Amino acid sequence: LPICTSYDVGLARAHPGASWRAGLVIVPVDAVGEVVDDFLADGPGRALAGSLAWEALRIEAGRPRWARDVDERAIPHELDWLRTAVHLTKGCYPGQETVARTLNLGKPPRRLAILQLDGLAGALPEPGAVVRLGERAAGVATSVVRHHDLGPMALALLRRGVPADAALAVEVAESTEGAENTESDGPAVLTRVDAAQEVLVSPEGRAQASPAERPGAGLRKSLLH
């Protein structure tokens, strides 16, 4: 087995974050100024940016963030984390059986995708907003940002069976405060923002390292005879 693998089987283009590298540095509060000065002096063209810019670049690269895009049911196959964060040849770690079983036998029930949101809509969806295919819930938006070049976009966990070319919509809660012809300020009204997918994890549910034939198929046939 290779050390790592990706869930891009059958996709026409490479993962947008395949060559993206980023990291977080934790420093004492009283050392922040010195660290920033060293960073700016370390090379030409460096500049400071805020957390929203960081989020925009992360979402553009299709990289999930712990505690934002990951819930208690998530497995690394759904997030394409087998590409960078899971070693396939090391054993004896919590969750190893689930990782191996899903890689060899199963298909991850959900898949991470980038959503390009309708730029004409005013409000952005909140993280946790429902993604719909027609009237059916197809998944949930996990991170949402307004990118400086690409406009509104999001990461979303979708059901694996959602077609890659499906027209989706994300629910947006808009406040009625200040709206005309309303007798009182009621609860927020749910509207929808159209969304187009950029597929990160193949709907086929197979990784590059997945076996061509399900393991044990021959044994099963011999038992039947």
Identify the meaning behind each predicted range.
Residues V32-E34, W66, P163, E204:
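Short, acidic Gly/Pro/Ser/Thr-rich loop/turn segments
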Residues D30, E34, W54, Y93, ...:
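Conserved active-site and cofactor/substrate-binding residues in soluble primary-metabolism enzymes
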Residues A74, L82-V86, Q96, A100-H225:
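Glycine-rich, small/acidic residue-mixed loop/short-helix segments
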Residues G23, A56, R68, T89-G91, ...:
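Conserved active-site beta-strand-loop modules that form the wall/rim of enzyme catalytic pockets
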Residues L1-P64:
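Acidic, low-complexity central loop/insert segments
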Residues A61-V86, K90-P94:
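Active-site loop ensemble at the mouth of alpha/beta enzyme cores that anchors a bound cofactor
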Residues G23, E34-F39, V70-E72, R111, ...:
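A short secondary-structure junction signal
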Residues R13-P16, G23-A31, R58-R63, K90, ...:
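Short, structured patches in soluble enzyme cores that scaffold and shape functional sites
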